[in-house]
C-alpha cells in the first residue's frame, strides 16, 4: 500500500490536508474468468454481517481485526458485505490484511421478493436505488480490496437495477458489477446465483460461459451443515469458469444473555427469545461458520 497525501491551499497557505492508503491492481473479466492482475483467482469467500454479541450491530476496530484473523485462519480470502456498505474502517483493514471485497449497496426489499410488485419495477423507487448505488461507489472507490460492486440483495430485478448497473459502470469501469436476480435476463458481469446445486453448477460451468460463476451465497452454514463443500470444490477445480463462492454466512447473529441469576452462565439469544412475539425468521439468525462469540463451529474445520 501507498499513502496518498492531498492538500488544498489558498493565498494564505494550506487550508486542509487528508491522507489515505491506496494500492494498484487490475480487475477484469476475460475468457469467462475473473482476473486479478491478469491471473484467475479462486474465491474462498464468506458473507459477513457486522455483529457483536455484546454490542449488537456495533463493531470496533478490535472486533474487525478479530474477524479478519479468523478468516485468515480458515483460509477465507474474500468477503461480501452482506447486505450493506460496512464501516469505512473495514475496507482499510481488508486493504492492509489482504482480503478481496464484494461491496454491496444497501438495497434489500426481501419482503417484496421477485413478484410483479417488487420495488425493482417501481419507478417511484428508482432514485432510492440510484442514490444507494452511487454512494457506495463514491465512498469506497479508492480501496484496492474492493474488486466487485454488488447492487443489492434479493430485491427482484427490473429497470431500477438496470439503471443502477449503468450508473455504477459510468462511475467506475474498472470493476465488475454483480446482482444475483439479474443473472438470466438483467445486467450483471458475474453469474452469481444463490444455492445452485452441483448439477446446475456443472451445467453452467461446462457450457463455455462468457461470465464466471461465483455463487454469492452457498453451503448454508446452519446447524450440522457444509458437508457438501468438497463436491463443490471438486467442480471449482475442474472448470476454469467456476471460481468459487461465498458461504452463508460467517458469524451467528445472536446476543449474549445471562441465563442464571448470578450472571455466571449465559446463552446466545435473538428474536422470540426476548418475549412471546417472534420477529425473527425462525432460526435464520444463526447460520454462521463461527458462533457469536467467535468460537469455531465444527463445520468451520
Predicted segments, located by residue:
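Aromatic- and acidic-residue-enriched carbohydrate-binding clefts of CAZyme catalytic domains
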Residues: 44-49, 57, 104-139, 270-281
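Substrate-binding clefts and catalytic carboxylate motifs of secreted carbohydrate-active enzymes
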Residues: 147-149, 204-301
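Short, acidic/turn-prone active-site loops that include or flank metal/cofactor-
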Residues: 105-110, 182-183, 196-198, 219
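Hydrophobic faces of well-ordered beta-strands that scaffold small-molecule active sites
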Residues: 44-46, 79-81, 101-103, 147, ...
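Flexible loop/turn segments at secondary-structure boundaries
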Residues: 50, 87-88, 155-159, 185-187, ...
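Secreted/periplasmic carbohydrate-active enzymes, especially glycoside hydrolases
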Residues: 1-101, 131-133, 147-148, 164-170, ...
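Active-site neighborhood of glycoside hydrolase catalytic domains
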Residues: 96, 120-210
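Aromatic- and acidic-residue-enriched segments that line the glycan-binding/catalytic groove
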Residues: 91-102, 114-127, 166, 257-272
Amino acid at each position: 500500500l501507498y499513502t496518498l497525501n492531498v492538500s488544498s491551499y489558498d493565498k494564505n497557505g494550506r487550508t486542509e490536508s487528508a491522507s489515505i492508503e491506496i494500492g494498484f491492481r487490475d480487475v477484469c473479466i476475460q475468457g469467462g474468468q475473473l482476473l486479478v492482475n491478469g491471473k484467475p483467482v479462486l474465491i474462498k469467500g464468506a458473507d459477513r454481517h457486522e455483529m457483536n454479541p455484546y454490542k449488537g450491530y456495533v463493531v470496533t476496530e478490535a472486533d474487525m481485526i478479530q474477524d479478519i484473523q479468523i478468516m485468515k485462519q480458515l483460509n477465507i480470502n474474500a468477503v461480501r458485505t452482506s447486505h450493506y456498505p460496512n464501516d469505512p474502517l473495514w475496507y482499510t483493514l481488508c486493504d492492509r490484511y489482504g482480503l478481496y471485497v464484494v461491496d454491496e449497496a444497501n438495497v434489500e426489499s426481501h419482503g417484496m421478493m421477485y413478484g410483479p410488485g417488487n420495488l425493482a419495477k417501481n419507478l417511484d423507487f428508482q432514485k432510492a436505488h440510484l442514490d444507494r448505488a452511487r454512494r457506495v461507489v463514491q465512498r469506497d472507490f479508492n480501496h484496492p480490496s474492493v474488486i466487485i460492486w454488488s447492487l443489492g440483495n434479493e430485491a427482484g430485478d427490473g429497470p431500477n437495477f438496470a439503471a443502477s448497473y449503468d450508473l455504477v459502470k459510468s462511475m467506475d469501469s474498472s470493476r465488475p458489477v454483480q446482482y444475483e436476480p439479474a443473472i438470466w435476463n438483467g445486467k450483471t458481469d458475474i453469474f452469481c446465483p444463490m444455492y445452485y446445486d452441483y448439477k446446475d453448477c456443472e451445467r453452467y460451468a461446462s457450457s463455455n460461459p462468457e461470465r464466471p460463476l461465483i455463487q454469492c451465497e452457498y453451503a448454508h452454514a446452519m446447524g450440522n451443515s457444509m458437508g457438501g463443500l468438497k463436491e463443490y470444490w471438486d467442480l471449482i477445480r475442474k472448470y476454469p469458469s467456476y471460481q468459487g463462492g461465498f458461504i452463508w454466512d460467517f458469524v451467528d447473529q445472536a446476543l449474549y444473555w445471562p441465563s442464571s441469576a448470578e450472571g455466571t452462565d449465559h446463552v446466545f439469544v435473538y428474536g422470540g427469545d426476548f418475549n412471546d412475539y417472534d420477529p425473527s425468521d425462525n432460526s435464520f439468525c444463526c447460520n454462521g461458520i463461527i458462533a457469536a462469540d467467535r468460537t469455531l463451529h465444527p463445520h468451520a474445520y
